[in-house]
Regions:
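Hydrophobic positions on the alpha1 helix immediately C-terminal to the Walker A/P-loop
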Residues: 35, 39
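Conserved NTP phosphate-binding and transfer environment spanning the P-loop NTPase/kinase superfamily
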Residues: 137-139, 145-257
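Conserved lysine of the Walker
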Residues: 32
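Post-Walker A helix-loop "phosphate-sensing" segment adjacent to the P-loop in P-loop NTPases
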Residues: 41-51
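Extreme N-terminal, non-catalytic leader segments
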Residues: 1-23, 27, 48
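Conserved nucleotide-sensing/catalytic segment adjacent to the nucleotide-binding pocket
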Residues: 51-52, 58-122
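Extended hydrophobic secondary-structure segments that form protein cores and membrane-embedded regions
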Residues: 21-26, 52-55, 180-182, 245-247
Length: 257
């Protein structure tokens, strides 16, 4: 498993004590959450302690999301969660710092987001409902579809101009990553199929999920963002430390570096 081998090597060679924070980036439906869970399990088999977080955990509260949308009425991408600008970046920074520095035997509460709240518009759960993570840890996997994206010099899509500007705030996350793993789609349209499949599996399991048409419509909103920001990520990882790029075929399996 190249991802586990890469992550364990980065952990073994990390220059400072404390947990390795691995940034895991990849398009929607590519298997980030599954891989993150596999890495946590793999470290467990090695007798090491690990947990995984998602950028989704630190989405804005619903009232903050509404305020953002009202602030930029001409930018429909801010009507709902997802794009750069819809996360509490400072909350994410504090969370990563806490997991890295808390005293042994203590616990850190991790934000939790309820995507079903407000008829599917979503809201952050109250602090008392946040799960606790026991520390110290050896590995923190921090995953997200737009993790590692950096501002484009000249965004060609005016609808993404403000989101591009918001990306500058996310540098504080990159500064806390000790290694970076990029799952890249070999073809852009794979992303659409992956999301449709994911929603289909969710429905088949008995959970609420988008129809095929709804899932395709939803994910196509993000394709311009991938086109704008992914090329730079391919050329230049967001950190100076160890990084690995895995190109995925339509079956989500690596086809090459």
């Amino acid at each position: 498993m190249p991802a586990l081998e890469f992550t364990h090597r980065a952990f073994a060679e990390r220059p400072v004590e404390g947990p390795l924070v691995l940034g895991l980036s990849g398009p929607q439906g590519c298997g980030k959450s599954t891989l993150a869970a596999d890495l946590v399990a793999g470290f467990g088999w090695l007798g090491l302690r690990a947990t995984c977080l998602s950028v989704d955990d630190v989405y804005l509260r619903r009232d903050e999301q509404v305020a953002l949308s009202e602030r930029f009425p001409g930018a429909p991408i801010f009507a709902d969660r997802g794009f750069p600008g819809t996360h509490d970046v400072e909350l994410g920074r504090r969370l990563l710092d806490s997991l890295a520095t808390v005293e042994p035997g203590e616990f850190v509460r991790v934000p939790s987001y309820d995507k079903s709240a407000f008829g599917g518009r979503g809201d952050r759960k109250p602090h008392v409902e946040w799960p606790e993570v026991a520390c110290p840890l050896d590995l923190v996997v921090f995953e997200g579809w737009m993790l590692g994206f950096t501002p484009a010099s000249e965004p060609t899509d005016p609808a993404l101009a403000q989101a591009n500007e918001f990306l500058r705030r996310y540098e504080v996350w990159h500064e806390r990553l000790g290694a970076f793993l990029h799952l890249d789609a070999a073809a852009p349209d794979f992303v659409v199929g992956w999301r449709v499949e994911a929603e289909r599996r969710r429905r088949e399991s008995g959970a609420a999920g988008l129809t095929d048409a709804e899932a395709e419509s939803y994910v196509r909103r993000f394709l311009p963002a991938y086109s704008l920001w992914t090329p730079a990520l391919r050329d230049r990882p967001p950190i100076q430390g160890p990084s690995l790029r895995l190109v995925l075929g339509s079956d989500r399996l690596p086809v090459g570096p």
